[in-house]
């Protein structure tokens, strides 16, 4: 059974945060991966174990043409990898800040390495709140709305909001694994995000 999951990502392209004062709900885990990557199963196992443990992560699997197939990667996901300059698979970007390259086969797991990153980030507060909702419009058309409010001080420049639409429980055998999870199907509105420079922004898109 396939399951659609929504993740909202506030991405700081430049600058840093200060006077952060709102507890975060989760840690963003962008994993650059592919079904043809022999070392990527350990990354997938690490993410699965963290979710099973109930840890507050937002996994976003970014498949690219480097190690995946056209049914999993898009021009947007390739662009996302180029943005970070990804050269090794798998590579984890935690909150867009911490980086861990490397993995293993289907009998191995990156859990301990990823958990260490989670522990570093989960208590880092944020100057933003994000509320996400979605509704069915008609037929197979949905509308997603993200409301971002600035509640603290932030000295970052070029701040952007991006919504990642992911799909999980795709029945596909790959590198000894039974299914593919958190596959990025769309970056809304695009991989460039929506510029945010004021106190509040509402992003509404249909897909």
Residue ranges and their predicted role:
Residues 15, 26-29, 90:
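Short, proline-centered helix/strand-breaking motifs
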Residues 45, 55-207:
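Short, conserved sequence motifs used for protein processing/export or organelle targeting and
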Residues 12, 32, 183:
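Residue-level signal for pocket-adjacent positions within structured domains
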Residues 20-62:
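Local sequence-structure signature of Cys/Sec-based thiol-disulfide redox active-site neighborhoods
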Residues 1-24:
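Bacterial Sec-dependent N-terminal signal peptides
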């Amino acid at each position: 059974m396939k399951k659609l999951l929504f993740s909202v990502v506030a991405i700081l392209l430049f600058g840093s945060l200060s006077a952060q004062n709102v507890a975060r709900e989760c840690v963003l885990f962008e994993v650059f991966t592919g079904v043809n990557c022999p070392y990527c199963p350990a990354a997938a196992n690490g993410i699965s174990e963290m979710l099973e443990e109930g840890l507050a992560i937002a996994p976003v699997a970014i498949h690219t043409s480097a190690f995946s197939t056209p049914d999993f990667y898009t021009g947007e996901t390739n662009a996302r990898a180029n943005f970070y300059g990804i050269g090794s698979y798998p590579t984890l970007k935690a909150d867009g800040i911490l980086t861990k390259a490397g993995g293993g086969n289907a009998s191995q797991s990156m859990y301990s390495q990823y958990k260490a990153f989670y522990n570093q980030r989960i208590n880092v507060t944020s100057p933003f709140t994000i509320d996400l909702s979605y509704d069915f419009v008609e037929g197979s058309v949905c509308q997603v709305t993200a409301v971002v409010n600035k509640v603290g001080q932030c000295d970052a420049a070029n701040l952007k909001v991006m919504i990642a639409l992911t799909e999980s429980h795709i029945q596909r055998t790959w590198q000894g694994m039974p299914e593919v999870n958190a596959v990025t199907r769309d970056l809304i509105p695009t991989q460039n995000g929506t510029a945010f420079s004021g106190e509040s922004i509402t992003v509404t898109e249909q897909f």
